[in-house]
Amino acid sequence: MRKIILSALAGTAALAATPAFAQDDAQAFNGGHVEAITGYDHISDGDDGILYGIGAGYDFRINNVVLGIEGEVLESTAGDCLGNLCVDAGRDFYIGGRIGAVVAPRVLVYGKVGYSNARVEVTQGNVEDHANLDGIRAGAGVEWQFRNSPLSVRAEYRYTNYELGVERHQGTLGLAFRF
């Protein structure tokens, strides 16, 4: 009889613990986050480079739909030289929104759109100048949150169309801390 009671208590405890895991998954992609970002950067008519920076945002989860706002500050090594004329990509600011669907308990597929401002630095000999370019960024990605952890990783492709016909293609990886 004692074994039956202990087995029943153990089974009840296991069933009671199950909703706790489901609740953790239900809270995935809800709240604030900060992230480190790195990836590939290509600017039209220029050499490829590496981008790196930080981002922050806040997500609102409604059932399996996620709405979010986010911002980023990035730097890039992309640039090109022709003789003594060099054009280098500088910093890149972004602010925008994203909408996504939770397709598995800790997997989010999303699209994003927003405003981007990039600084391009031009050097000819000893003379330096810069220009700020405004543009629209659109992208898509997937984010995976680790089980029972505030960490998530994301992979993303984004395209930005700046004024003066300048285009940018980026492939990024991010490591986010969610709170």
Q: Which residue stretches match the model-derived regions?
A:
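Cleavable N-terminal signal peptides
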Residues: 8-10, 14, 20
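Gram-negative outer-membrane beta-barrel domains
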Residues: 2-5, 19-179
